[in-house]
Amino acid sequence: MDTTEVIKNWINKKSEVLDLGCGNGEILKILRNDLDVTALGVEIDNHNINECIKSGINVIQQNIDEGLTNFGNQSFDVVIMSQTIQVLKDPKKALLEVTRIGNESIVTIPNFGFWMTRTNLLLSGKMPVTGTLPKKWYETDNIHLCTIKDFENLCEECSIDIIEKRFFNDRGRESFLANGVPNFFAALAMYKISK
């Protein structure tokens, strides 16, 4: 399965879904069309907001780093934060907010412990550029990179339950190696969590 299929399997039909850092709204559009969810996106980029609006996705322009107090406790069935947490100033605070707002949350992270990332850093002596980390260090929005172990330790520290987890290779697909030794062979990790 790929990441979109896993997300679809983790969300019930007609759920209320909030996507923090929704980008162009593509995943919300798929969920709305396939699962009849009530979808709301939060995005900071003007171009992405316009793309959401063109697709009929309800979207709020908001900087997640400035807080999410406009959302009540458990106000959504599911909150999605896909490849967003590493660009935020305070990932721990964001993770606590995600679990406060949603009954369940789906968080996807690029794994800085992925073997290609490690090898690239080791051999080149420079910050890696990979499929999941596609920009040079001075162009990237990523400021808090972590490994799978780092993220799972943070969940434990915050008393956040990991309900389910899936691991994906650099092509965005589940694989034997990614699932067998995820901190080394998974380029991307996806977690279903709650508090």
What are these regions (language model features)?
Residues 67-73:
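Short conserved loop adjoining the S-adenosyl-L-methionine
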Residues 13, 74-75, 101:
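Alpha-helix C-terminal capping/helix-to-coil transition sites in glycosyltransferase folds
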Residues 1-14:
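Conserved alpha-helix/loop element of class I SAM-dependent methyltransferases that forms part
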Residues 26, 30-67:
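Class I SAM-dependent methyltransferase SAM/SAH-binding core
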Residues 21-23:
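Class I SAM-dependent methyltransferase "Motif I" SAM/SAH-binding loop
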Residues 92-97, 104-194:
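S-adenosyl-L-methionine-dependent methyltransferase catalytic module, highlighting the catalytic core
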Residues 80-89:
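A short SAM/SAH-binding and catalytic strip from SAM-dependent methyltransferases
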